[in-house]
Amino acid sequence: MRTISIILPFFKYKHYFKECLQNLAQSTFKDFELIVVIDHPTEDIDDLLEEYNSIFDMRIYTLPEGVTGVAACRNVGIQQAKGAYLYFLDSDDYVLEDTLQNMIKAMDHDVDMVNGVLNHTWNNKANYLHKVENKEVDEEDQEEREQRRLNKLSDFVSFASYEKDEQQAQAIFYTMDNRRGIRTFTVLGNLYNRDFVVRNNFKFNENFRYYSDMTFMCPLLEKLNTFLRVEDAVYVKRKHNDPINEPALSQEENDNRFNERCDAVEYTRTLLKEEGVVRFCLDRKIVSYFVSKMSKRIRRSQDDLWRTDYFERIAKTIDGIRPEVMNRYKRNSKKMVACLQNRDLKGVQSCVRRKLGIKKFFRVFKNKNVLFKLAYYHIYSKKPIQDNVILFETFMAKNYSDSPKYIYEYIAKNYPGKYKCVWALNDGHEVPYGAEVVKRFSFKYAYYLAVSKYFVFNVRQPLWYRKREGQVFVETWHGTPLKRLVFDQEEVTSASPKYKQQFYRQRQEWDYLVSANPFSTKTFRSCFMYEGKMLEYGYPRNDILYWPNKDEIAKDLRKKLGIPEDKKTILYAPTWRDDEHYGKGEYKFTLALDLKLMMEKLSDEYVVLLRTHHYIADNIDTTGLEGFVYNLSKYDDISEIYLISDICITDYSSVFFDFANLKRPVLFYTYDIEKYKNQLRGFYIDMNTEVPGPLLYTSEEVVDAILNIDQINEEYKERYEEFYKRFCCYDDGNASKHIAEEVFK
C-alpha cells in the first residue's frame, strides 16, 4: 500500500496539466499513488497519461455521463484511494520538491490533518522560484511572520472562546479564519488522514461547482482532534494570466456564482453545530463578503439585480448568522448589516456611501495624486466633448517621438488652425507648431482625457481612463512584433500579472490600430484579440526614412551631437527583459556587450550610439568610453538616430524592422536567446533563418562581424531582400498622410 493517495482532477488546459505532472515527478517523496479523475475533457490527454503512467503508480478514472465538477472528481478519488493519507492537487497547480516529504514526517505524530503553506502565483514553477530567490514574492522573515500569526491565533482563540482545544483552534485559524474571503477557503495544501476522512464520511457536495470545498472542510474541522502546521511544505496555487480565454475555476464569470455562494453557506450550516466555532467563522466570512465586496456593487453596479434579487438573497443568508458574529465589526458595518436584515436598501447605500467616502478621504490624504482621478470621474467626464481637440502621447509621456509625432506634425502643417492639439509630456518638453503641453497624470491631463474627441497614443491608455461615447482612439503601437505579445504569450513575467485582463479591456476602446505590414496585421489580430479597423499604411515614424531631405537631416544631427565626420556609426539598441524589473514600466538592464573591447578594436573607424529601450530605468555607465560611446538613450526620436547609423546592433527589439527600411547592416547580439525564447516571451519568427543578419553570442563575435561587415552584407544579401519585401512593404513615406486623411475627416 502506498503512503499517500494524490487525488488529481482534470477538466481542461492540457499545458497546465503537463506542467503539474512534470513538477510532481520532481518530488523527493515517491511513495504515492496518483489518482487521476477525468471530467469530460475537450482535449486529448492520452499521450500525457501514457507518458506519466510509466513514471507514477497511476490509476485513471472517468466521470460518467451526467456527472461533472471538481467535487465529483474528488469524491471518486476518495472512494478509490488506498493510501494512508489523502492529498488534493489541482491540475493547474504544483507543489515544491520537498513538500510531500515534509508533510509525511509530520504525520509521524499520528494527527488527523497536516496543514502546509498555500502560496499564490501567476507564474510557472521556474519563474515562481526565480521571483522567490530574487525576493519578488512576499517572503517576509519567517520568525517575524510566524510571530504575527501566533498573535492573531492567540486573539482568535480568545475571541472564539475555544481555549479548551488549541490544536483544533489552530486548524480552524490556519485553514479558515486566517484566509480572506470564501473563495480562498480550500482543501488544498493539507494532508489528511484517510481513515479519519472515511470514518466520518466527509464528502464534497457535488451540487456546487465553485464552493464545494467548504462542504468538505467545515465538517472536517469540527470533528478534527489533532493537527500540525508545517511551514516548509509549500503548495503553489496558480492563477491563470489569461482569464479571458483560459480562466481558472476561481476566475470564471458565471451568473449563478452569487447564488451558489449563498446556497453553499446555507447548506454547510446544516452540517455544523449551531453554537460551534466553525459555524461562527463561516458566518463571519459571509458577513465580511457582504460588507467589503457586495455592498459596493449594490451602490455602484449598473445591474439592478444587486439591488433587488441579490439583495434579498444575501439578506436571507445573513438572517441566519449568530448575533455575536457582529461584535467585532465597526459601527458602520454593524449598521449596514442591520439595514440589510431590515431590507432597508437606502440604509445600506447610505452606509456604503459613508464607508467609501471615508476611504476616499484617506486615499487622498495619503496620496494627493488621487485627486486628478476624482476630478476626471466626477467633474471633467460630465463636460461636453470638444470635437476639435486631439490628445497625443508616446511612451507614457516620456518623449516627443514615434508615430504620434509624425501624425501630429502632418496635421499641424496641413490643417493649420483646424485642430487644437495637446501633447502629454513630462520633464518640460517643448513641441513645435504651438501644441499645448500637459504633464501626464495631472489635472489638465485628466481634463483632456475627458473632453478630447481624438486620441493618438503609441502605448496603452491609463487603466483609469473610460472612453466616452463619441471619442475616437487611434492606437499606433510601437513596433512590428518579434517577441510574442499579450494573448500569444503563455507565461507573463512582467511587472503586472493582470496584464492580459487589463489589455483585453483597454483594446476594446481602440477604434483604429496601425499596422506596418501584413505580418503585423495578422499578428495583432491574434495577440490583441483585436477585431476593429486596421490602418495598413506602414508606420508614420518611418516616414522620415523616405523623405527626400533625409541626408540633410542626418548631417545636421551628426553635427548637433558632435559625432566626428570621419567616423562611421554603430547603433546599439537593446530591449528590456520581462523578468528583470523594479516595478511597473521600470526594468533593470545589465550591459552585456563589452564596449571597452569594441573601443579597443574599432575606435579608429567607428563610434557607438547607445540607445536603450524606454522601459529601462537603469542609467548605463559609460565612464572611460568618452569620445567612443554616445549615450542617446534620452534622445527623443530614434527614427532620426537611424538616419545617422551605418550599422545596427540589437537583440530582440523591434528596431531592426524599422531600420531595415534603410537596407543597412543589422547584427543580432543574442547572448541570452535560449532564456528569452523558451522561458520569457518566445518569438513569432525564427531568428536563425528569417532575420536579416547573423546571431552573435559574444562580444568578440560582434567585433569580428563589424570588422568583416562587407562579407556579412554579401552573405545575408538575399535574406535581407526577402525580409525587406515582407516587413517594409507598406512604408513609403506617406503613412502619416494616409492615416490623417482617414481618421480626421
Regions found by a protein language model. Give the residues of each.
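Glycine-rich, basic loop-to-helix element that forms the pyrophosphate-binding segment
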Residues: 64-81
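Donor-binding/catalytic cores of nucleotide-activated saccharide
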Residues: 94-231, 235-256
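Conserved catalytic-core segment of nucleotide-activated headgroup transferases in glycan assembly
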Residues: 399-413, 527, 540-622, 696
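Short, acidic, metal-binding catalytic loop of nucleotide-sugar glycosyltransferases
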Residues: 22-31
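A nucleotide-sugar donor-handling region in carbohydrate enzymes
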Residues: 373, 482-582, 719
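Membrane-interface aromatic/basic loop that binds lipid-linked glycans or pyrophosphate carriers
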Residues: 299-383, 391, 409, 413
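Short aromatic/hydrophobic "clamp" motif used to bind/position activated sugar donors
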Residues: 86
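Catalytic binding pocket for nucleotide-activated donors in carbohydrate/polymer assembly enzymes
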Residues: 654-727
